[in-house]
Structure formats: C-alpha cells, structure tokens
Design a protein with these regions (language model features):
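A short helix-loop-beta-strand connector motif used in the catalytic cores of GNAT acetyltransferases and
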Residues: 12-27, 45
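Conserved beta-hairpin
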Residues: 22-36, 41
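Conserved acetyl-CoA binding element of GNAT-fold acetyltransferases
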Residues: 41-54
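Conserved acetyl-CoA-binding loop-helix of GNAT-fold acetyltransferases
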Residues: 57-70
Length: 118
C-alpha cells in the first residue's frame, strides 16, 4: 500500500513537473525500488520529502536534502530553502541544518516553518 502511494505521488508530481520545471526533484532507489523522493518547487520551496518507514534512519533523507541543497544553492532567488514541517519531522530538519523561521501554526500534525540559508 505504501509503495502504491509513492508511485501515485511520483506520477502526479511528474505531471506537475512537466508543466513547471522551475525546481528540483530526485528519487532514491535501492535495487530498482524507489524508497524515497524529494521535490523542491521554484528552487526554494521544499514541498515533499518522503522515505519509506523501513528505510528511515539510514541517511536517505539526509542524502536527499543535501542533493536538493546542492542543486538549488545557485538558483534559489532567496538564497534559502524553506519548508513547513510536521512536529514528527521537526527534529530531522534541525539535524540537517534547518532553523525554525516563525511560530508554529495550529494544524493537524503540526506546521512549523523552517529555513536553510546558503
């Protein structure tokens, strides 16, 4: 079921990407299976980061974030990468160098603004 969700998300993002190519996307595969992906819109808005639960805590998310930072560093109009994190992922983003950039918003699962400055 989770792989189906990943496949459907990647397919819908691919359609979006074909029409809006100002950004970055990358997939992380192991033995031909996509186990994670990242999407950054307009070279500054990290909109999607996902790693399958069985592959979390092996550095895949960190590698995907670093690839996005490297790709967007020179093209980001704000020289920053921004995102809104759930409370679940907040510690991860702090560990990879993001700083909270505003107050948390009351949303299901949390909504904490973060940014990474280049």
């Amino acid at each position: 079921a989770t792989q189906f969700l990943i496949d459907e998300t990647i397919q819908s993002l691919s359609v979006w990407w074909d029409k809006n190519s100002s950004g970055f996307q990358s997939k992380y595969s192991i033995e031909g299976e996509i186990v994670g992906f990242i999407v950054v819109k307009d070279f500054w808005n990290l909109s999607h980061l996902f790693v399958l639960p069985n592959y979390q805590r092996f550095g895949i998310g960190k590698a995907l974030v670093q690839s996005a930072i490297d790709a967007c560093k020179e093209r980001s109009p704000e020289k920053k990468l921004k995102l809104n994190s759930s409370t679940y992922a907040a510690d991860f983003y702090k560990c990879v160098g993001f700083r909270q950039s505003g107050p948390s918003l009351e949303r299901p699962g949390g909504c904490i603004p973060y940014e990474y400055s280049y």
